Amino acid sequence: MIFSADFPGGYGGKDLWISEYDKREDSWLSPNNLGADINTDGDEMFPYLSENNTLYFSSNGYIGLGGLDVFKAESTGDKTWGNAENLQYPINSPEHDFGIIFERGSDKRGYITSSRVDLGGKGKDDLYNFNLPEIQFSLSVFVSNKETNEQIPGVTIKVTGIDTSTA
C-alpha cells in the first residue's frame, strides 16, 4: 500500500510511504519513505500505482504549472521508482490537479480531479475523463557546412524521446 502522511523522518510536508501486509502476522509492516526521488519539502499526495507499476501522484513541491500537479515515476525494481516527471498540459493546469487513475488495461484513458476552469469547470474540484492521444510531430532538418552553407550529404539524424524511444 502506498499512502501519503506527515510522519517524522520525512522530507517535509506530506510524503509518500509504502507498507506491505504480512499475511503470516496478519498485520501491516512499518512503512518506508519512498525517498528523495519522489518526496520534496512540499506535499506529495494522492498516489496511484498503475497496472505496470508506474507511480502517479500529485505534488506542490516540484516546479509545475501551478497548485498541485500530477507526476509519474517509472518503476526501477522492487518497490523503487525513478525520478518524478511532470505530466504537463493537458493533464496539469494552473490550478490543482490530482487523483489521477487509468481505466483497466489502458495507459491513455482515465480520470482526474481538477479545480481548473478552462474546460467548463466551476473552479471547485471537478472530475474529468481524458484520452491521451499518441504524440506526433514533424521535424525538418538541414545540415550544412558552417562556412560554405553547402548541404552535407549522408547525414543521419536520430531523435530520442524522454522514454528512450527513437525516430
Residues of each region from the PLM?
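Short, conserved micro-motifs composed of acidic
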Residues: 1-142, 146-149, 156-159, 165
